[in-house]
C-alpha cells in the first residue's frame, strides 16, 4: 500500500505565481505519476475540496471543514476506489470538547484544528484484505502545548477504540513541529509507532 501526505496550501490570493490556479495541473500530474492508494491532504478549503472530488479520477474524498459551520479548511483523505474500502469515518476537533464544531484549546492560535479519522480495508489481491485505522491531522502552527495536547488526544482515542481493535494505526499529516520538539516526544515515547519519514529531510 502506498500512502502520501500532502499539504496542498490554502488558496491565498497573495501567492501570485504560486497561486492554486497555477498549481492545479501540477498537483494532478504528480498524483497520476505516484498513484498512491491513500492521500492525506491538509489546508483544503471548501472550493478546493470540490475541485479534488471532481478531478481526482478513481478516488473518493472525505473530510469536513473545521469551523463552527463545518466550513473553512479541512484535512481531507482521498482513497482509491479500486483498492480501498471505507469501513467507518469520524471527524473530531483537537480540543477539550472534540465533538463541538470549531472548538480549540485555549493555548493555541485562533484556528480550530480538526482530525479526520477512518478505518479502511485495503485489498492486497484476491482474498487478501487488510484493515487499518488512519488519522489525518494538521497541528497548530503557533502553540507547542496545543500540538502536544492534540497528539495526546488522538493517541488516547486510538487506545480506546472499541471497534476493530488491534489493527494497525497510521498517524499522518502536517505536524508543524521539528523532529526533536517536545511535542513529538509524545510519539517517540510510544514504541509501537515507527517514524517512516525519518531520514528523508524537510519538504
Predicted regions and their residues:
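Proline-centered loop/turn at the N-terminus of a beta-strand
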Residues: 2, 60, 168-170
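Sec-exported extracytoplasmic/periplasmic mature domains
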Residues: 32, 36, 53-57, 159-163, ...
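Acidic/histidine-rich helix-loop elements
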Residues: 5-23, 95-109, 143
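Metal-dependent phosphoesterases centered on the DNase I-like endonuclease/exonuclease/phosphatase
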Residues: 142-203
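Active-site metal-binding loops of divalent metal-dependent hydrolases
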Residues: 7-8, 137-139, 173-175
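Glycine-rich phosphate-binding loop signature in dinucleotide/nucleotide-binding domains
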Residues: 33-35, 122-129, 160-167
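N-terminal, active-site-proximal structural segment of metallo-dependent hydrolase catalytic domains
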Residues: 1-55, 66-73, 130, 152
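Structured beta-strand-rich core segments of catalytic domains in phosphoester-bond hydrolases
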Residues: 38-135, 139
Amino acid at each position: 500500500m502506498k500512502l502520501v501526505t500532502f499539504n496542498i496550501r490554502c488558496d491565498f490570493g497573495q501567492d501570485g505565481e504560486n497561486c492554486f490556479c497555477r498549481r492545479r495541473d501540477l498537483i494532478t500530474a504528480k498524483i497520476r505519476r505516484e498513484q498512491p492508494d491513500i492521500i492525506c491532504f491538509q489546508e483544503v478549503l471548501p472550493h478546493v475540496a470540490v475541485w479534488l472530488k471532481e478531478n481526482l479520477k478513481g478516488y473518493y474524498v472525505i473530510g469536513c471543514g473545521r469551523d463552527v459551520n463545518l466550513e473553512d479548511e479541512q484535512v481531507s483523505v482521498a482513497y482509491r476506489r479500486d483498492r480501498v474500502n471505507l469501513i467507518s469515518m469520524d471527524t473530531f476537533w483537537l480540543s477539550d470538547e472534540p465533538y463541538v464544531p470549531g472548538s480549540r484549546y485555549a493555548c493555541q492560535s485562533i484556528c480550530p484544528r480538526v482530525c479526520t479519522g477512518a478505518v479502511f480495508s485495503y485489498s492486497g489481491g484476491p482474498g487478501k484484505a487488510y484493515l487499518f485505522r488512519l488519522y489525518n491531522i494538521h497541528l497548530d502552527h503557533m502553540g507547542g502545548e496545543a500540538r502536544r495536547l492534540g497528539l495526546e488526544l488522538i493517541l488516547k482515542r486510538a487506545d480506546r477504540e472499541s471497534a476493530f481493535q488491534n489493527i494497525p494505526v497510521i498517524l499522518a499529516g502536517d505536524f508543524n513541529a521539528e523532529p526533536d520538539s517536545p511535542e513529538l516526544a509524545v510519539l517517540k515515547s510510544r514504541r509501537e509507532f515507527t517514524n517512516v519519514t525519518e531520514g528523508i529531510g524537510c519538504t
